[in-house]
C-alpha cells in the first residue's frame, strides 16, 4: 500500500492515559467503566489483550466489565499491569449480563468454553477457529440451529485493506472473478478471504491438495521480541490449491514467518474476466475495451507508544483508502490508535453487540465459520497424506 499522509502522536500506555466514567455495578457492587456495549473476556492470554486495548481505545463505545482468569495469581497480574477488573468467578461474570462474552482461550478449548457460556444464555464472540474437529463443528451447528448466539471472530474480511479491495472488486471493475492467489493469512483465515474474494458460498464443495515445504529463513520478529543478530532457522511454507465445484480456484501460499516478518510480503492477486487486482494495483478494461491501470492508495495515521513490545511500539492505523478518486474506506468511528487487526476486531465487537440485541444480523455467520474451520481440517489432511481431498458439505445440513 502507498502512504500518502503520515501523522504521528506520542502517547503513554493506554492503561495510564485514559480516564473513564465509572459507576457501581448492580450485580456485584464493583466500580465499572460505563460504555455503550458491555462485554467480558474469558481468558487472559496474548489474544485476549487485543480486546482490552480496544476497550481502552473506545471507552465511549465499550465497557469491559471483567476479565475471567483461572487463577488469582493471573488475575492479580493482569489487573495490575492493565488497570482493569479481573475475577476468578464465573458467576460474577455472568451476573454482569454482558452483551457478549469474548472466548479467548487455547484453541483446543474454544468450542467447549463457547458452549459453556452459551448454556448460560450469553452471546459469545469466540476466537478462531470455531473448532478443531468435525464432531465439535457439528455440535456448534446444533447450538446455532437451537437458537443459541455465537459469532466467531473471523476478522480478516473486516480489515480496512480487505474491505476496500472487496468493495472495489464488487463494483464489477474486473468482471466476474474466477481465480486468485493469496499469500496473506493462514488456514481458516485464508479460506475466509478466498471465499470472500471469489464469492463462494459456505456450502460450496471443493477439492484441496497441498504440500508443506521448509526453507531456511532469517528470523526477525515474534509476538514478543525482535531479533537483529541474523539468526537463521528452517521455516514452514504451505502451498495448496482449492478447486471449487463452481469452477473457481484459489491458490493458497502461507509462510510461517509471514504475519510479522518484514522480509515476507503479504500479497493478493485476484483475476476476473475483464481485469485483475494485484495488491495495490488494479488492471482493467474500460467501456471501450482498452486497458487501464489504477493504484489503490492508502493513508496511515502513525501512533508511537511506549509499549516495550516491538509489535505495539508503532501503530499504523488506516486513515483512508481510495482508488481513482473514489473513497473505498474511512474509519467509521474515527481514529482510535488501533492497528488493522484491532480495527477489524472492534468492528466485529460492535456488530456482535447489535446482534445480541436483535438490532442486526450476525456479523459472521456460523455457517461461514464452520466452512472455514472445516476447510482448514481438510487442508491439513491433504498436506499430511499427500492426497487430493474432497469436501462433503452435506453434514452441515444434517
Regions found by a protein language model. Name each.
Residues 231, 244, 258, 269, ...:
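C-terminal glycine/acidic-rich active-site capping loop/insertion
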Residues 28-82, 96:
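N-terminal Rossmann-like dinucleotide-binding module
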Residues 98-100, 106-107, 111-158:
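Beta-strand-loop-alpha-helix segment that lines the small-molecule cofactor/substrate pocket
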Residues 85-96:
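Short acidic low-complexity segments
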Residues 160-179:
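Rossmann-like NAD(P)H-binding beta-loop-alpha module
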Residues 176-269, 283-285, 367, 371, ...:
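Rossmann-like dinucleotide-binding domain that binds NAD(P)(H)
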Amino acid at each position: 500500500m502507498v502512504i500518502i499522509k503520515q501523522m504521528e502522536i506520542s502517547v503513554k500506555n493506554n492503561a495510564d492515559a485514559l480516564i473513564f466514567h465509572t459507576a457501581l455495578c448492580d450485580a456485584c457492587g464493583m466500580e465499572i467503566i460505563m460504555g455503550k456495549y458491555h462485554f467480558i473476556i474469558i481468558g487472559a492470554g496474548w489474544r485476549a489483550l487485543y480486546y482490552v486495548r480496544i476497550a481502552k481505545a473506545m471507552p465511549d463505545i465499550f465497557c469491559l466489565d471483567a476479565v475471567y482468569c483461572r487463577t488469582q495469581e493471573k488475575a492479580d497480574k493482569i489487573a495490575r499491569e492493565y488497570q482493569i477488573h479481573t475475577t476468578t468467578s464465573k458467576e460474577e461474570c455472568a451476573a454482569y449480563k454482558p452483551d457478549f462474552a469474548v472466548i479467548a482461550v487455547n484453541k483446543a478449548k474454544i468450542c467447549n468454553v463457547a458452549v459453556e457460556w452459551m448454556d448460560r444464555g450469553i452471546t459469545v464472540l469466540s476466537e478462531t477457529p470455531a473448532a478443531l474437529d468435525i464432531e465439535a463443528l457439528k455440535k456448534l451447528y446444533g447450538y446455532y440451529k437451537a437458537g443459541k448466539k455465537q459469532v466467531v471472530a473471523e476478522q480478516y474480511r473486516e480489515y480496512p485493506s480487505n474491505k476496500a479491495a472487496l468493495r472495489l472488486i464488487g463494483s464489477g471493475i474486473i468482471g466476474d472473478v474466477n481465480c486468485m492467489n493469496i499469500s496473506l493469512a493462514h488456514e481458516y483465515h485464508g479460506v475466509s478471504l478466498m471465499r470472500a474474494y471469489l464469492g463462494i458460498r459456505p456450502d460450496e464443495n471443493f477439492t484441496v491438495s497441498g504440500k508443506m515445504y521448509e526453507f531456511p529463513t532469517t528470523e526477525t520478529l515474534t509476538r514478543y521480541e525482535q531479533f537483529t543478530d541474523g539468526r537463521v532457522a528452517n521455516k514452514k511454507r504451505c502451498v495448496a490449491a482449492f478447486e471449487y465445484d463452481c469452477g473457481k480456484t484459489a491458490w493458497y501460499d502461507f509462510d510461517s514467518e509471514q504475519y510479522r516478518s518484514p522480509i515476507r510480503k503479504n500479497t493478493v492477486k485476484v483475476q476476473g474476466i475483464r481485469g485483475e487486482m494485484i495488491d495495490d494495483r488494479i488492471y482493467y478494461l474500460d467501456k471501450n475495451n482498452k486497458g487501464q491501470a489504477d493504484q489503490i492508495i492508502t493513508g496511515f495515521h502513525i501512533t508511537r507508544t511506549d509499549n516495550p513490545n516491538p509489535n505495539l511500539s508503532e501503530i499504523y492505523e488506516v486513515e483512508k483508502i481510495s482508488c481513482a478518486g473514489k473513497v473505498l474506506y474511512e474509519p467509521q468511528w474515527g481514529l482510535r490508535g488501533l492497528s488493522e487487526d484491532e480495527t477489524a476486531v472492534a468492528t466485529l465487537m460492535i456488530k456482535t453487540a447489535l446482534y445480541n440485541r436483535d438490532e442486526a444480523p450476525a456479523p459472521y455467520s456460523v455457517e461461514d465459520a464452520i466452512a472455514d474451520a472445516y476447510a482448514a481440517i481438510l487442508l491439513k489432511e491433504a498436506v499430511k497424506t499427500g492426497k487430493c481431498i474432497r469436501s462433503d458439505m452435506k453434514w452441515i445440513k444434517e
